[in-house]
Amino acid sequence: MKLKRLLLVASAALAALVFSAPAMALEKFKIGYLRVMDDAQAMAAYEAGLYKKYGLDVELIEFKSGTDLIKAIVGGQLDSGVFGFTNAVAWASKGADLKVVSGAQLGYHAIVAREDAHINKVADLKGKNLASQAEGSTADVVLKGVVFRDAGLKPDDVNVLGVSPQVAVQSLVGKRVDAAFLFEPQARIAQLIAPVKQIYEIGEVWPFPCMVVITSGETLKNRRAAVWKSLDAQRDAIELLKKKPADAAKLIAGYFIAEPTLKTLKHGEMLREDVIRDAIKSQTFSAKLNDKEQNRMQEIADILQAQGSLKTRDGKPFEVKSIVDLSWQKDRKL
């Protein structure tokens, strides 16, 4: 009887210890992102608790541009980031050890113009003011190396202002610029709140992997399991965005529109979740980087070199495959 009582006491003590102890410690992991729809999977994974599902305690850190974000990865302040790969190419050409480990989103960039600016096609931008991303960003490279080129424009034919997407929208509303080259949802928001129209969308004519997931070679070597867990979480978030855009919109709408509703010019007050849902539907998210997309990445790197913005140590063409590590993608059989 005494033995039975002792066993009961011991069992109760053990149970108390188990339930009072904190849950298994999550591994800390820092991810940089931009507040644009291209990075929706990073935000959705955080808000849906997917990082925790895979054992990570993630700190999401916002940056205004990929050119700033890459510095934090090179400097060791971040474990990974979702942003344009041209930033990694530029730093890798100087010797930085960086790795593209996953896809994220295929480029959606729209040119929207004020209706009173008399801009109906890209060629009409000559002599106009255009808000875009920071110089050297993937958006900037594609704008000048593809969009302008195909329209017969030279980079200096247009006064390009490098600002954040949020400032670009404000500049359109305030008539400080004639047009803007925007991500979603800023392109959609601009058309809802200001007298502007879309005249071009690069994804329709020249699709490319705009956003990818990048980490440092050191982080991938020393924390490969954690990097892969973060990619698993973002892959799940991409499935949520693709299959349940309305549910995903409820999670991330607050990142883009502060108030519950958006006051529009023609549709009255719109729920922010409805605006973001439609923006999500316009996107092509993919964690996989296929051969076609890798070839397009090489094409963009070649444009960088042709512009003189990318110089390798030996003067040879930069090989994008030298910074691509798709071991996670292969292991997950994507």
Predicted regions and their residues:
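Bacterial N-terminal signal peptides that target proteins for export
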Residues: 1-10
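Periplasmic-binding protein-like
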Residues: 40, 105-113, 192-219, 223, ...
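Short, glycine-/small- and polar/acidic-enriched structural segments
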Residues: 25-162, 167, 171-174, 178-184, ...
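Conserved C-terminal helix/tail region of periplasmic/extracytoplasmic solute-binding proteins
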Residues: 297-334
